Amino acid sequence: MKNIAVVGYGVIGKRVADAINVQDDMSLIGICDIISDWRIQNAVRKRYAVYAATPEAEKEMKAANIAIEGSMQDILEKVDLVVDCTPKNIAAKNVEIYKEQGIKFIVQG
């Protein structure tokens, strides 16, 4: 079983997370984002573990009463693969992090 994280839980990321969640050979470790609105509330309702992509996002999520499992670094320590669904300017920065840590990744966005 492969442990997968979805970074970016927007239009694409929510669909990718749902698809991963129904696979027999994959485990969705969680989703990671900067938002604290209804999209993340939907992830919580689906019982997806939520991780904050930035310290600012962590503060906003806590203010919105969203239970978070940790930071982006925390989720990266648990995965075999990341599917990055962030906008291209963010994904480009994230790719450098994945490469530095030797994490396999797919950029989907």
What are these regions (language model features)?
Residues 1-109:
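N-terminal Rossmann-like NAD(P) cofactor-binding subdomain of oxidoreductases
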